[in-house]
Amino acid sequence: MSVNSIHLVGRAGRDPEVKYFESGNVVCNFTLAVNRRTSKKDEPPDWFDLEIWGKTAEIAGNYVKKGSLIGIQGSLKFDHWEDRNSGTPRSKPVIRVNNLDLLGSKRDNAEATMNNYPEEF
């Protein structure tokens, strides 16, 4: 038996990017910043790349903004490609989101937008 399941709660690191395909499929990509439970208050968050498909992608595109508090459930996958300049194989971990929970109130989300998370790392 094997299990590939991830549950995270954090804040959107940037506004979602939504792409519509001719086939009718929709994909949404953005980052999630998750703070670790630690006694160090200055520790930076962990960053995760998220990929959401279908109706959930449209919901994320409409309601998630930079700083929004969300919960996700999904699975880990690796995107693989070849570097255009060097031809070196590359890969990066991506979380394929199956369930998205919009957490917090509108006021919480408005305040979070003023949070000082750096853009991407």
Swiss-Prot record:
Q: Keywords of this protein's UniProt record, alphabetized?
A: DNA-binding
Q: Which GO terms describe its cellular component?
A: nucleoid
What Pfam families is this protein classified in? Answer: SSB
| Alphabetized InterPro entries for the sequence | NA-bd_OB-fold (IPR012340), Primosome_PriB/ssb (IPR000424), ssDNA-bd (IPR011344)
Which Gene3D superfamilies does the protein's record reference?
Nucleic acid-binding proteins (2.40.50.140)
Q: Does the keyword Iron apply?
A: no
Give every SSB domain span.
3-104
SUPFAM superfamilies (UniProt xref): Nucleic acid-binding proteins
From the UniProt record, give one GO term of the biological process aspect. Answer: DNA replication
- What GO MF terms are annotated? enzyme activator activity; single-stranded DNA binding
Reply yes or no: does the keyword DNA-binding apply.
yes
- PANTHER family, alphabetized: SINGLE-STRANDED DNA-BINDING PROTEIN, SINGLE-STRANDED DNA-BINDING PROTEIN, MITOCHONDRIAL
Subunit structure and binding partners: Homotetramer.
Task: Provide the protein name.
Answer: Single-stranded DNA-binding protein 1
- Supply the source organism for this entry: Synechocystis sp. (strain ATCC 27184 / PCC 6803 / Kazusa)
Per UniProt, what is the name of the gene that codes for the protein in this document?
ssb
